[in-house]
């Protein structure tokens, strides 16, 4: 509670010192840096088969938190799967990093994902993260790890969407949790608070886990005029529009291209912009000697190209491809992955459909998920993944620099 009081004091002083025009109607915004799926595990000794950047994931967590501070974030929001297996040692390693972020002046809020309750119970989880949301909650749900927190005139409604049945991928929201959720929304409406809701599992996108209570939760948010729901779980940025609710699946800050979400809470809405972590700048100011960290963009691009080439090779198997066809397939698949990761896929979807490597990938991927996934990803691309503003339930795309085809 002390750090929120400090934040409010700083905000009050800033308002007192602000120009007269600010006193005539402008509202100081609250800036939130959000990420999901950090999967912290100090014992990682992998070659990065699932995520090529896994060997550097602890450094990338540090770089992300440092970058968030450089972007003047007030709040660091972690949307679940903050550890890899829910082991106490993993939680303790993350908590040490969160304390460092807090010491830099950022308030920290966490919620659990499907990987976070393992060796620790739900009660132990809340105790471990008492300084990062649970000990400062305005209200806590008695049936889950859901809670709310009030920051200024913004209510953070943080949902625990995980089911604790012993099966990692089970998810649900109980009737009791939904009643608690509606109570928080009703209170916010009565008090005139703006609501930002978040959870680990998506509620709107069709590309995620179906679970009990999902549709009812989304409808509650629509009914109470909530404009934005943040989540993770998919490890890839995704924007899905409801009737008046926008869902943003935030980036995984430890995987290519190492971005996170910057959310500005404004007077009647939100502004979202993806932010690339300046890993090389972080490494240089820390005096790191590792050349991969010091030229990180080039390093992670090489790894992503190699990963995409590996996918092509596995799909090809014993099938006959000329050297030119293989190069075209690799070029297509890397561009598809790269544009999707950077949020520019809708801009280049038409070009990629005409790319000679597109038909080759679908052909060699026949009978696999890729033959369905590639057309689906190209058709589902939306322009809002480069950033957007929300005002009164209306979404507008932020202008973004043109990527290189």
PLM regions with names:
Residues 23-91:
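N-terminal active-site segment of His-dependent metallophosphoesterases
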Residues 23-27, 284-405:
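Non-catalytic terminal accessory segments
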Residues 29-45, 153-164, 196-198, 245-251, ...:
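Active-site-proximal beta-strand elements of phosphoester/diester hydrolases
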Residues 36-61, 85-86, 119, 123-140, ...:
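Acidic/histidine-rich helix-loop elements
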Residues 41-44, 84-87, 112-121, 164-167, ...:
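Active-site environment of divalent metal-dependent phosphoester hydrolases
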Residues 68-75, 155-157, 168-248, 322:
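His/acidic metal-ligating clusters that form di-metal
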Residues 88, 92-179, 242, 246, ...:
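Extended active-site neighborhood of metal-dependent phosphoesterases/phosphodiesterases
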